[in-house]
A protein has these predicted regions:
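Active-site-proximal segment of zinc-dependent metalloprotease catalytic domains
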Residues: 1-67
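The catalytic-center signature of Zn2+-dependent metalloproteases
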Residues: 39-120, 125
Length: 126
C-alpha cells in the first residue's frame, strides 16, 4: 500500500520511516518520503526498490523476528535489522546520504547473513 503524506511524526520509532511492515502480510510505503530523498539517493526508483525489498525481508521474518540466527548480524541498536550497511536489511538508507551521492543507489539486495537466515528458515533449521 502506498500512502500519501508522512509517517506519524509524534512516534520517534517511525517518524523518519520510508516504509513500514506490519503483521505478517502487509507493508506500506510513503511515496512523499521517497520523493524527498530521491535526489540524494539515486532516484525514486532505486529508493522504492530498496524499501520494498527491505519490507519484504521483514515479512519473511528478517532479521531475527521469529527465530534466533546462528550468525551474529542483528544490530543491537536497531532490532530486526542487520548491522551490515551493504545489506538491504540495514536499518536506514538515509543515514548514509552523503556517501550515497558518490556511491550510487542504496543497497537493494540481502547480505550473505540474511540469505543464510532465509535458507535456515526455508529448510526448517530455525
Amino acid at each position: 500500500v502506498a500512502l500519501r503524506g508522512q509517517p506519524d511524526q509524534s512516534d520517534p520509532g517511525i517518524a523518519s520511516s520510508i516504509g513500514i511492515a506490519f503483521g505478517a502480510t502487509s507493508f506500506v510505503v510513503f511515496p512523499d518520503r521517497v520523493d524527498d530523498l530521491a535526489l540524494l539517493l539515486g532516484g525514486a526508483d532505486a529508493i522504492l526498490r530498496a524499501v520494498v525489498v527491505h519490507e519484504l525481508g521483514h515479512l519473511l521474518c528478517l532479521v531475527n523476528l521469529s527465530y534466533d540466527s546462528e550468525i551474529d548480524h542483528e544490530d543491537p541498536e536497531h532490532p530486526g535489522h542487520s548491522r551490515d550497511d551493504t545489506s538491504v536489511m540495514f536499518h536506514a538508507i538515509e543515514t548514509t546520504a552523503i556517501g550515497q551521492l558518490f556511491q550510487g543507489a542504496p543497497p537493494s539486495t540481502f547480505g550473505d547473513a540474511d540469505l543464510a537466515d532465509l535458507e535456515g528458515l526455508r529448510t526448517g533449521r530455525y
